[in-house]
Amino acid sequence: MAIISEVEEESSSSRPMIFPFRATLSSANPLGFLEKVFDFLGEQSDFLKKPSAEDEIVVAVRAAKEKLKKAEKKKAEKESVKPVEKKAEKEIVKLVEKKVEKESVKPTIAASSAEPIEVEKPKEEEEKKESGPIVPNKGNGTDLENYSWIQNLQEVTVNIPVPTGTKARTVVCEIKKNRLKVGLKGQDPIVDGELYRSVKPDDCYWNIEDQKVISILLTKSDQMEWWKCCVKGEPEIDTQKVEPETSKLGDLDPETRSTVEKMMFDQRQKQMGLPTSEELQKQEILKKFMSEHPEMDFSNAKFN
């Protein structure tokens, strides 16, 4: 037979003991808080005496860290989703607004106000621009679709093909200081534009050759320059490749002939990468000066 008091003592001894724990956690010293926890465990329990105490503590720490990582990851995902959703909403609203705007504007737009469609330029035109200056023809000019022109230093000759049997009275030819306009009456001008350089209108002439070619003679104002084109806007020639007719040099006065010969010489020198007449003259002067002053050291001197 059991006594009631003994039963109560047995039941009370089987219950776990609860001890209050008081400590303050400082964010600056979290390890201090843990030290107090372990001190408390050592004083109030036999947990630290267990051989597996350290392993159990490590497992608990790892579990806490894993739990923290999961919580942070979940929070980061929520924060990243919100801006994306908002951005997507804004994009959808914009697209809807644009569509509504287009639908409402369509009936009121006039055909003339439609945006012009850009037409792709032919490859030939692009190639011409990229290719740069063209090689001159045998007359140091250019053969174009509607006319051709040749030149020497004093004059430019323009030849314009016209229907066979064309009479002079049907030709319209206006030669001004800086402009040339040529064509047939009642038709659009064949040539109409600003000249590359000015001419002397009083010394310019035109005539019909064999009733099928309008030939125009333009006398240059500056008779020491090669023209790159006859009318501005037309393809330009490479004046470095101009070849003057040597047979005509004898017709020039001595001064002009000397200048032309100098220009021809300089042009050939440049094409070969050699010094021009002016550069050669400077070199001769420098050599003479150096020979007259042997006492001076020019080894480190730089010459332009």
Curated annotation (Swiss-Prot):
Localisation per UniProt entry: Cytoplasm; Cytoplasmic granule
Residue ranges that the Swiss-Prot or TrEMBL entry lists as coiled coil: 54-106
InterPro entries: CS_dom, HSP20-like_chaperone, NudC_fam
Domain of life: Eukaryota
Positions of post-translational N-acetylalanine modification: A2
GO terms under biological process: developmental process; embryonic pattern specification; flower structural organization; heat acclimation; inflorescence meristem growth; leaf morphogenesis; pollen development; protein folding
CDD domains hit by this protein: p23_NUDC_like
Known tissue expression: Expressed in all seedling tissues with highest expression levels at the root tip.
Gene Ontology cellular-component annotations: cytoplasm
Segments of skewed composition (Basic and acidic residues): 118-131
CS domain sequence ranges: 142-231
Annotated segments matching region Disordered: 111-141
Function: Small heat shock protein required for the establishment of auxin gradients and for patterning of the apical domain of the embryo. Involved in the specification of the cotyledon primordia. Also required for normal inflorescence and floral meristem function, normal developmental patterning and thermotolerance. Acts as a molecular chaperone.
Stated name of the protein: Protein BOBBER 1
Source organism per UniProt: Arabidopsis thaliana (Mouse-ear cress)
Gene that encodes it: BOB1
